[in-house]
């Protein structure tokens, strides 16, 4: 059963400006500890695109849950990782989402400077039969 769909688009140049002003603060506000480890391994040239994609992904996932960031789900509640083939994997830890468990999140990310986009689909793991 479909729970929701969310999308977000981010100007990478906007993130570059924020990083110039607040190089570490912004990353620590948006990224979880697992994501910060990945971020630290990147060259600075890739930081803005990485952060822009994570920002867009977290916004898209929160919208798919029907709430948006700060309305039951925060940036630190959502972790975006990648499998061995590069496919984005989403981990969510929030009291808001506990009532929806179990669920699957499908996420697609794309970037082509100066923008990146994220598209999320959330479905319940239960099959609901309506009569």
Curated annotation (Swiss-Prot):
It comes from the Bacteria. The keyword Magnesium applies. Its cofactor is Mg(2+). Keywords: Cytoplasm, Fatty acid biosynthesis, Fatty acid metabolism, Lipid biosynthesis, Lipid metabolism, Magnesium, Metal-binding, Transferase. InterPro entries: 4-PPantetheinyl_Trfase_dom, 4-PPantetheinyl_Trfase_dom_sf, ACPS, Ppantetheine-prot_Trfase_dom. GO terms for molecular function: holo-[acyl-carrier-protein] synthase activity; magnesium ion binding. GO terms for biological process: fatty acid biosynthetic process. It is an enzyme of class 2 (transferase). Mg(2+) binds at residues 8, 59. It holds the Pfam family ACPS. It is found in: Cytoplasm. It catalyses: apo-[ACP] + CoA = holo-[ACP] + adenosine 3',5'-bisphosphate + H(+). GO terms for cellular component: cytoplasm. Gene3D superfamilies: 4'-phosphopantetheinyl transferase domain. Its EC number is 2.7.8.7. Belongs to the P-Pant transferase superfamily. AcpS family. HAMAP family: AcpS. Transfers the 4'-phosphopantetheine moiety from coenzyme A to a Ser of acyl-carrier-protein. This is Holo-[acyl-carrier-protein] synthase. The lineage of its organism: Bacteria, Pseudomonadati, Pseudomonadota, Alphaproteobacteria, Rickettsiales. The gene is acpS.
């Amino acid at each position: 059963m479909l729970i929701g769909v969310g999308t977000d688009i981010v100007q990478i140049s906007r993130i570059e400006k924020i990083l110039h002003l607040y190089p570490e603060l912004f990353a620590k506000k948006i990224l979880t500890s697992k994501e910060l480890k990945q971020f630290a391994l990147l060259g600075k040239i890739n930081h803005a695109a990485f952060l822009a994609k994570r920002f867009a992904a977290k916004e898209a996932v929160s919208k798919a849950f029907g709430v948006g960031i700060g309305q039951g789900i925060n940036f630190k509640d959502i972790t975006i990782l990648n499998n061995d083939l590069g496919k984005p994997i989403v981990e969510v830890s929030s009291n808001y989402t506990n009532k929806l468990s179990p669920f699957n999140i499908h996420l697609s990310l794309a970037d082509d400077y100066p923008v990146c986009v994220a598209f999320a689909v959330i479905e319940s793991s239960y099959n609901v039969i309506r009569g």
